[in-house]
Amino acid sequence: MRITSLIDVDNTLLDNDAAKVEIDRRLTALLGASETDRFWTAYEAVRAEFGVVDIPQTMARTLDSEASLEKRIALADLFMCFPFRDYIYLGALETITFLKARGPVVILSDGDPVFQVTKIVRSGLTELVDGQMLIYPHKEEHLLEIGAAFPADRYLLIDDKPTVIERFTARAAELNGPIETILVRQGKYAAEVPAGPWPGATHTIASIADVPAMLG
């Protein structure tokens, strides 16, 4: 049986909340407190408008037309050269290795096609999954494409967002194969569901490191 694992990145393989804290510190050092506040205001406005984090769009809205070229480059470098590898969760790499023994592993993430790809590549995760990666603004709207790109007898979805798991489950028929889901209680979305096993997912775990022991 061919099992394809679809794994999210932010707060699933990589501690995005902790990375944002460090990014905020670096932004403040570069821009000052006032302009950093303007950046995060633009960040949330862009996310509300498009339903996805878009760093290039956020940067464009943060810097006014008089911002120097040096400042623009420094801000872009802050994100494009950030050490995301340092924020990979303990046990995440071992989980990927375990899943690859069962079948193909695909990174399936939301985000803009520039920054999100850079984040995943710089973290080293792309190499671990042999370059198999799909990035969409809203991945739950692309099950037909996912199924066509990675046909399988069965799918395993691992994500930290309850809403993503619910939407994948509701549209599972589009994958042309049954789907098993794992909710990982990491990051800010962990508080969205009550403590204990969540009935919306096949499995609920506290850490990405728990996957090998749970699946055996």
Residue ranges and their predicted role:
Residues 13, 105, 157:
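Conserved SAM-binding loop
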Residues 93-106, 110-134:
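Substrate-recognition/cap helix-loop segment adjacent to the acidic, metal-dependent catalytic center
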Residues 1-41, 64:
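Active-site neighborhood of HAD-like aspartate-dependent phosphohydrolases
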Residues 19, 30-33, 43-81:
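A metal-dependent, Asp-based hydrolase signature
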Residues 57, 80-106, 140:
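Short, acidic loop-to-helix structural element flanking the phosphoryl-transfer center
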Residues 1-2, 121-216:
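Asp-based, Mg2+/Mn2+-dependent phosphohydrolase catalytic module
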Residues 12, 19, 113-114, 163, ...:
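Conserved Rossmann-like nucleotide-cofactor binding loop
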Residues 6-8, 108, 157-158:
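Generic enzyme active-site microenvironment
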